[in-house]
């Protein structure tokens, strides 16, 4: 286990935002479904992205790093598909397992999906219901969903999904249904949450020549027998990661974020609007933020659940009360993120009450500091690291290595901006 100790400090400077993990997954998958070669630039090798690359390779993709630039990949689908049983380790990546399950069923296959940590317990019921309806054989251990063995082939038709589940299930079907022999419809039975992630999937597929007809987010018509074309695509910066630095600037600094796209479809771009509503000094042209006096607001997290950990930190250091609502899905992420943030922020001296679907936070000028746990969750660790900037004493975070899931260089970037960061390992 690794630990970091962060002393209170002011951050200043420019930071190159890592490539979007969400867009990286989608670009790699689309390229791997095309028999024409694609070039995907600006890939960051987080654990989650590596899991998707390895998984798509197991399903028949040829993925080669550019000899001159290892952040560039050459990808295409190989025509021959192995009939042997395929084993795919998804590590702790929910995107990988939920995207690749339907993809593995485009052709007749026998596949075992496995994973680590909390991933073995994150729900897959939406797919199990489809398997039962479409007569696809599957099995998994009692009490958990992985390892999951699947045997069969997906058939085109009607697919009913509720809108209040992870959008990863909807995206997973969108990656597979265009390649089936008949037309399909995804019918959304309740109000769709995380719309931005669905938009990103549809847009990425379109870049590779696949058309999906969006009928006001109530249903999606998907014509069968489509083919992906090869293309060249550069992954833009990740707003969910930029959120940590924009928040850091507002709490105690002056930070400019580089490599972001103001026209991005990323749902987490809403961080700009939320921080401004809280009184944060945000320049949307330069993607910069500086120390500001912020105040509490009501935050509806239904469309931006990944922002809740860092927004709860900003709320804990803002005048007045902040209420975060519609965030129940955070209880089944890498950790129970509502419980994790309430528990760890309170250790630092914050006033956070855990609600059934959110958090109630009474802000303070400063927190005390102390020792906290990462819950083996990258977003919890990074949020607590930013909280340390406005504490009276140092903050020690146990299990800090978990940031490798999405942002391996987070602690070094914190140092680069002037953070007083000390890292050490306690061994296994």
UniProtKB/Swiss-Prot annotation:
The active site is at 306 (proton acceptor). One of its GO terms (cellular component) is cytoplasm. It catalyses: 3-phosphoshikimate + phosphoenolpyruvate = 5-O-(1-carboxyvinyl)-3-phosphoshikimate + phosphate. Keywords: Amino-acid biosynthesis, Aromatic amino acid biosynthesis, Cytoplasm, Transferase. CDD domains: EPSP_synthase. Pfam families: EPSP_synthase. Pathway: Metabolic intermediate biosynthesis; chorismate biosynthesis; chorismate from D-erythrose 4-phosphate and phosphoenolpyruvate: step 6/7. It is found in: Cytoplasm. It is an enzyme of class 2 (transferase). One of its GO terms (biological process) is amino acid biosynthetic process. Catalyzes the transfer of the enolpyruvyl moiety of phosphoenolpyruvate (PEP) to the 5-hydroxyl of shikimate-3-phosphate (S3P) to produce enolpyruvyl shikimate-3-phosphate and inorganic phosphate. Monomer. This is 3-phosphoshikimate 1-carboxyvinyltransferase. It comes from Clostridium acetobutylicum (strain ATCC 824 / DSM 792 / JCM 1419 / IAM 19013 / LMG 5710 / NBRC 13948 / NRRL B-527 / VKM B-1787 / 2291 / W). The lineage of its organism: Bacteria, Bacillati, Bacillota, Clostridia, Eubacteriales.
